[in-house]
């Protein structure tokens, strides 16, 4: 999925006809490293402990569901003209996001709890809002960790983005779903039954809405540059994963009624927790797809983080940037550097950021991809700060070794 999106640029799609598009798609499917993609997903799931992260997000989501529902209901209550959008949103929740067996009980409980929120005082409402924001900040921290971002956005900017998503998101989704319901009603009024083509179109619309929402999450939340085609690849993975998980869980509950037998009427709670966990696992794997799409499209497998790898990457980056300056080039992008070094962009980014912190490399934040330029003179710049930061800490016990190895006298030119 990521290869299809990431290897087909917008100009290619506009210039190519339908036959060329199909041929390009078939070629991408044949050459895409599917096995490497599965290996990357498995490796990142294990090394980044995404299962534990999904459990944490499940717990936080359970606590924050009522506050989020309260905010949504408050928006619709403040504007009576949007009342019909609320009904469309509830219908979408039942039909699309949650398996049939638990959708109505969960929605009824959320609506009931959120409806009682007006009885709370000012302090209680503030706590509800802070709980909702805690979930959003947890998501922010998790996605930045997947993209290996060490410095998140400023707290005010993060709160503003998530608050806009929590308030405007349900409203825009409700408008879209209401227009969809109007189309269904009009179609039934004309032909008496919904045509199969219209049913497929509406299902595709629901699929696309979720994919677009996830793509927006992957594009805007990480404090790094994420191309839209990579974010959309992750969004499509999440949307497809939700459909498969929903049908699979519904089939399992129908065939193996273990929870209903043991828990009875209380079975909705453990089933819903399982669904939340599966949902977060799918979202996190979609984020991995979006984050590693650049390296996968270059047929590059992430190398193991052996001791000294970041130092090695920093030396290679300095060598490439020095060569680019000698050729008269105006800097290199992260993807270009990774392609030249045949390595994962996310794997060399920490070393590149360390060079920026040392003021040896400058980052140009212009339109398009960020570019990096070499600022220092390798012939006169001492290598000691880089050696101390990424290779060997000059502690008192190693001072003699540093002197014998002449680390303090070494320049960058001797390294590169």
From Swiss-Prot:
Superkingdom of source: Bacteria
One GO term describing the cellular component: plasma membrane
Pfam assignment, any one: Virul_fac_BrkB
Keywords of the record: Cell inner membrane, Cell membrane, Membrane, Transmembrane, Transmembrane helix
InterPro entries found in the cross-reference section: UPF0761_bac, Virul_fac_BrkB
Primary residence: membrane
Membrane topology type: Multi-pass membrane protein
Transmembrane parts of this sequence: 63-83, 120-140, 159-179, 198-218, 234-256, 271-291
Locations listed in the record: Cell inner membrane
Family in the record: Belongs to the UPF0761 family.
Name of this chain's protein: UPF0761 membrane protein Mpe_A1422
